[in-house]
């Protein structure tokens, strides 16, 4: 009798387990999605605390990029844009369009030579005040993208761009 109970119990557990897993996944799907999104955001973006005040950080980034020969476009006041769109208590956010010289041209040449599509870099540095009142600088995590590149030539160029970005932010971020 006990020989039959164990196999029957295992069979019942095997048949019921997918149902329990399906119920658990339905209950935890939103949490799993949030965790995966947070992991993706952590990998994609480089967020660092500034050593300076808000406006000083914006000015320092613009000056540092300009000294290095980067193109620097007009700073977008995202807080003002959100306020005009009706957002109350919009956080302080400024977006500085800037990129190392010919960064996207270098990527385009690799794309053309390899026949593989490579999207351009967004070439933006964002300065914001977080919920704790700290000035933060956020940009694309080019160093991570370089490590994740599927072929050597792309990894090399992305690594160079990451080093240029790091040099531009030296002394501004922690």
Q: Can you annotate each of these PLM segments?
A:
Residues 23-73, 81:
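Terminal, regulation- and interaction-focused segments at domain boundaries
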Residues 143-174:
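C-terminal partner/receptor-binding element of secreted or periplasmic proteins
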Residues 61, 76-78, 99-102, 131, ...:
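A mature extracytoplasmic/lumenal domain signature
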Residues 124-151:
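Beta-strand/loop substructures that line and gate deep hydrophobic ligand-binding cavities in soluble
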Residues 1-4:
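Positively charged n-region of N-terminal signal peptides that target proteins for export
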Residues 18-22:
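Sec/Tat signal peptide C-region and signal peptidase I cleavage site
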Residues 66-74, 78-121:
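Compact, glycine-rich, soluble single-domain proteins
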Residues 7-16:
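Bacterial N-terminal signal peptides
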């Amino acid at each position: 009798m006990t020989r039959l109970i164990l196999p029957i119990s295992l069979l019942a557990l095997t048949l019921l387990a997918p149902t329990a897993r399906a119920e658990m996944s339905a209950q935890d799907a939103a949490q799993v999605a949030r965790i995966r999104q947070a992991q993706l955001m952590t990998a994609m973006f480089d967020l660092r605390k500034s050593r300076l005040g808000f406006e000083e950080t914006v000015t320092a980034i613009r000056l540092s990029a300009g000294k290095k020969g980067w193109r620097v476009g007009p700073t977008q006041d995202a807080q003002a844009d959100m306020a005009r769109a009706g957002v109350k208590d919009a956080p302080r956010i400024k977006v500085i369009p800037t990129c190392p010289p010919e960064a996207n041209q270098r990527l385009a040449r690799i794309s053309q030579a390899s026949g593989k599509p490579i999207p351009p870099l967004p070439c933006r540095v964002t300065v914001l005040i977080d919920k704790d009142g700290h000035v933060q600088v956020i940009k694309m995590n080019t160093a991570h993208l370089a490590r994740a590149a599927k072929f050597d030539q792309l990894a090399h160029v992305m690594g160079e761009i990451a080093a240029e970005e790091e040099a531009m932010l030296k002394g501004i971020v922690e």
